[in-house]
């Protein structure tokens, strides 16, 4: 069954959705977006991601991340030009953080003491207490992937174009404006809304349960492996600590912050100093023992994760008698690691509403 589809948004969620939809050669797909791979803008979260695959969902909601893991694993093994590589990941937990998360009702599976993903990662193991960073109570490690977003996003766009997807730049004030933007010259019967944080103010959506989860990072030339992710830090309420070395010379990401509701787009030098100081304390070899002065900074950056109070929104909505909307937004900090699983869900919904629309003709 063929559909005329306009995908609004060209971040990792929009492009992955377009790619999987394009596998049906009957679909006529147009991607429209204000920002494209190669752009660096605080509104465009995807380039600022680490990015990696560190499961965050509960086991009951884990299917999106499970499906995506196997696709990223395939890309490492078969498509090296995608900019994804295997990298060992070390997770460090503090009991105070995990207990707080449990009380809040929003536990992060990544820091669970009995994580569901221990059976997904073949070499998963709990660390011996002697391996755990001072100040943390327990840890685990496994081989995951790290993604060079500067390579991966253009690769993803190229795969879409290879499959016949047409890409346009546009700024939409209302989701309904996408009805006039199909390259096929006719009204699309389906619009995929993959605008991320843009859904907060996009007319026709205006989802006020959306908010930025501000992330500040430092990108350095220094190399360091394995990846490091911690459940929390002693100082700085919105501060977290992580490190990941991107594939193919993409630099090493030092983080960071997870500050829900903070719209500040400029890097804070005090936060930057805290980020770097923490990293050189737990991983002094990254700077050859020279402390912060031994870090070769490429840039300081801020990205806005598309946080949503009730989690990701993937559902269909009737716009009018001609067109349906399929929403795919609100992924917060796990857009990459849920991208393929969520896109598969989008394909299912597109098939569902496409059949429903045609049955009424």
From Swiss-Prot:
A motif (Microbody targeting signal) lies at residues 359-361. GO terms for biological process: D-amino acid catabolic process; nitrogen utilization. Glycans are attached at residues 193, 222. Its EC number is 1.4.3.3. GO terms for molecular function: D-amino-acid oxidase activity; FAD binding. The keyword Glycoprotein applies. FAD binds at residues 10, 13, 34-35, 45-46, 50, 52, 305, 332, 335-337. Anthranilate 2 binds at residue 258. It holds the Pfam family DAO. Residues 1-22 form the signal peptide. Its main location: other. It comes from the Eukaryota. Coiled coil: none annotated. Its cofactor is FAD. InterPro entries: D-amino_acid_oxidase_CS (IPR006181), DAO (IPR023209), FAD-dep_OxRdtase (IPR006076). Keywords: FAD, Flavoprotein, Glycoprotein, Oxidoreductase, Peroxisome, Signal. Anthranilate 1 binds at residues 242, 305. This is D-amino-acid oxidase. It comes from Fusarium vanettenii.
């Amino acid at each position: 069954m063929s559909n005329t589809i306009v995908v609004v948004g060209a971040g990792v969620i929009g492009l992955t959705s377009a790619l999987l939809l394009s596998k049906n050669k009957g679909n006529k797909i147009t991607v429209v977006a204000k920002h494209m791979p190669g752009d660096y803008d605080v509104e465009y979260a995807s380039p600022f991601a680490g990015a990696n695959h560190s499961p965050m969902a509960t086991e009951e909601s884990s299917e999106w991340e499970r499906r995506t893991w196997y696709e990223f694993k395939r890309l490492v093994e078969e498509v090296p030009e995608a900019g994804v590589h295997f990298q060992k990941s070390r997770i460090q937990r503090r009991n105070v953080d995990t207990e707080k998360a449990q009380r809040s009702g929003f536990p992060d599976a990544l820091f669970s003491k009995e994580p569901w993903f221990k059976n997904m990662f073949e070499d998963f193991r709990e660390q011996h207490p002697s391996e755990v960073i001072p100040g943390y109570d327990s840890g685990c490690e496994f081989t995951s992937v790290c993604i060079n977003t500067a390579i991966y996003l253009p690769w993803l766009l190229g795969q879409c174009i290879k499959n016949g997807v047409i890409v346009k730049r546009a700024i939409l004030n209302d989701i309904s404006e996408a009805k006039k933007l199909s390259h096929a010259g006719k009204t699309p019967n389906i619009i995929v809304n993959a605008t991320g944080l843009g859904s907060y103010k996009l007319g026709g959506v205006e989802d006020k349960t959306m908010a930025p989860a501000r992330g500040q990072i430092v990108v350095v030339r220094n190399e360091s492996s394995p990846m490091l992710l911690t459940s929390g830090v002693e100082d700085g309420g919105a501060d977290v600590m992580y490190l990941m070395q991107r594939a193919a010379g993409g630099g090493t990401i030092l983080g960071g912050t997870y500050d829900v509701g903070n719209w500040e787009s400029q890097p804070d030098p005090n936060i930057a100093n805290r980020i770097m100081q923490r990293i050189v304390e737990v991983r002094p070899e990254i700077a050859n023992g020279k402390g912060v002065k031994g870090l070769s900074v490429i840039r300081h950056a801020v990205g806005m994760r598309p946080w949503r109070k009730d989690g990701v929104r993937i559902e269909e909505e009737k716009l009018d008698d001609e067109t349906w909307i399929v929403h795919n937004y609100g992924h917060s900090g796990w857009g990459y690691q849920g991208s393929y699983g969520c896109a598969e869900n989008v394909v299912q919904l597109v098939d569902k509403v496409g059949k429903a629309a045609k049955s009424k003709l």
